[in-house]
Amino acid sequence: SSDLDSASLIAKGKHLDFIIQDSDLNKLKSFSYYSSMISSDIKPNLKLGCIVKLDDNYYLCIQPLCDTERIPQKDEIKDNNPHKFLFVSVKSNSQMDFFVKSSDKFIGMRVDYSSITVMPVFGNENGVVPLNDNKYILYDRKELEYIACLKPMFAQKIANNFAANISRVGIDQFEWLRLKGRE
């Protein structure tokens, strides 16, 4: 049996495990981060894939792209009924969906599909929610701190997983019939 380096694979049952040395872990986190995030030079309007922070909580915007434009300005909102954006919570976790960068450290984040938040917004004269001084301003004047933005396909994958999760059909079926139907 020979020694294995960090790129070696070991077959165990029906899956493969990577052996990763600690010295390579930060490189992998960095590669994952830069593969899934848009450039930090781009400061996007609030849209699908934007990761924001409110108080000590992180959120991922899953509002469909087509619903992130033509947002009424604050003085155009009638009956105190502003446009609303949909977010899911993301939390620091060892089982991560993506990484965010904070103070030159990469933090693994996991989407919590069961924690949905709706936030009221208003648009500017161009009908979008712009980024100003690294913050998005909500209808109630709360400020969302901009953290990063996922590339469109990564964000769409998460939005699709969210939609699949909430669109499951649950019925109250007799157990004997449910089991009989599988035979």
Segments from the language model and where they lie:
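Extended alpha-helical coiled-coil/bundle linker/stalk regions that scaffold oligomerization
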Residues: 2-112
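C-terminal terminal-subdomain/extension
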Residues: 92-183
